[in-house]
């Protein structure tokens, strides 16, 4: 029989891999954004997005922009496709992180 602890760690690994995919897709989106919409790139602080002096309020703007699907009116189909992919990965990663937390609580109660 499969150990519940091993199953929990496998779930954690899947969650971390999906976080890495999300991070990579976000970096690729910012590269596309720099070329197709420089004003939006500046609006979300694309140049300083992943630096230590990045502005969290501008980072949250980009997440809100994608989550509210405001990108659907954009003129560049490549940008729309990448935003759709990123939105799906964000929802998947959020659900997996929630599942990890629920699993951790269940393991704490179980043992």
UniProtKB/Swiss-Prot annotation:
It comes from the Bacteria. The chain crosses the membrane at residues 1-21, 90-110. Keywords: Cell inner membrane, Cell membrane, Membrane, Transmembrane, Transmembrane helix. Pfam families: UspB. InterPro entries: Universal_stress_protein_B. Its main location: membrane. It is found in: Cell inner membrane. The keyword Transmembrane applies. It is a multi-pass membrane protein. One of its GO terms (cellular component) is plasma membrane. NCBIfam families: PRK04960.1. Belongs to the universal stress protein B family. This is Universal stress protein B. It comes from Yersinia pestis.
């Amino acid at each position: 029989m499969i150990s519940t602890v091993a199953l929990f760690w496998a779930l954690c690994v899947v969650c971390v891999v999906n976080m890495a995919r999300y991070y990579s897709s976000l970096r690729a989106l910012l590269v596309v954004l720099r070329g197709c919409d420089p004003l939006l790139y500046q609006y979300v602080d694309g140049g300083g997005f992943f630096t230590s002096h990045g502005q969290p309020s501008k980072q949250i703007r980009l997440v809100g922009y994608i989550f509210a699907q405001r990108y659907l009116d954009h003129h560049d189909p490549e940008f729309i496709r990448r935003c759709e992919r990123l939105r799906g990965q964000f929802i998947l990663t959020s659900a997996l992180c929630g599942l990890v937390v629920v699993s951790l609580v269940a393991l704490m109660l179980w043992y």
